[in-house]
Amino acid sequence: MTNLPKVTVRDLAESGVHFGHKISRWNAKMAPYIYGVHQENRIHIIDLRKTLPLLQVAMKALYDVAFQGGRILFVGTKFQAFDIIASEAIRCGQYYVNHRWLGGMLTNWGTVSSSIKTLMQYEKILNDEDSILTKKELGNIEKKKQKLDKALGGIREMGAIPDILFIIDTNKEHIAVKEAKKLGIPIVAILDTNSDPDGITYLIPGNDDSRKSIELYCKLATDSILAGIESSLAKSGVKIDDIRGDEFIQEKEDGIVQTKRRRSKVYKEEEREVVTNEDESR
């Protein structure tokens, strides 16, 4: 039995998910998901009764990928979303692109992998206390490192192309959508009234401009992913109560990226107290 996060139509409405774009900007393919028009502002109103079940299906898809130990890539480069995308992806131990999407990030993964290796080499050079490079040379390397880290930092540990994408605003991220479609990678995406739903595996009709709406989508996505990870661990015999507060990390072993658990500081402190108490009772 899945333990997906709970969400209601009221939750969606309170986050402004139902507000679409001006009617002049609409994509007719989104008509099935539009409730009507706000007469004063002349914007489309999204039918949240349609959004809710589609959202639940999409969250179940993310849960399933996480349960199987798959890689999930969060994509959102618009200014309303970039920081939320990064923090929520990190919270569930997954990956993200929150600045400019570089063409070929998926379809030319070999080149991207080489760039990631270069990034790591730069970091190694900069962390070498015995480096014989001049201050100017190190400064140039630092600039190159920062540029690569901004573009690739969120996927540096991914190890291979993702198993599914979670996208905010398919119009802005059209290159990511195109590459995912070409490779047959499933897409979970927020689609506003000006978006094209064709080829989107799991579409979620909703406002893709409001920070409050974006925060809700990303939180639900992350909570669904964490639920999938926890269910997978529970199936392996790990008690869920034992992993609360732990950090989930991705490690590569024998070419396979696996989700692993790093015990939290609180857990370690509690464990230390138990050992101390046992010693005192002897």
Curated annotation (Swiss-Prot):
Domain of life: Bacteria
HAMAP family: Ribosomal_uS2_B
Family affiliation: Belongs to the universal ribosomal protein uS2 family.
A GO term for molecular function: structural constituent of ribosome
Short name of one Pfam family: Ribosomal_S2
Gene of this entry: rpsB
Region (Disordered), start-end ranges: 260-282
Residue stretches of biased makeup (Basic and acidic residues): 266-282
Keywords: Ribonucleoprotein, Ribosomal protein
GO CC terms: cytosolic small ribosomal subunit
Species in which this protein is naturally found: Wolbachia pipientis wMel
GO BP, one annotated term: translation
rRNA-binding as UniProt keyword: no
Name listed for the protein in its UniProt record: Small ribosomal subunit protein uS2
InterPro entries: Ribosomal_uS2, Ribosomal_uS2_bac/mit/plastid, Ribosomal_uS2_CS, Ribosomal_uS2_flav_dom_sf
Listed transmembrane segments: none
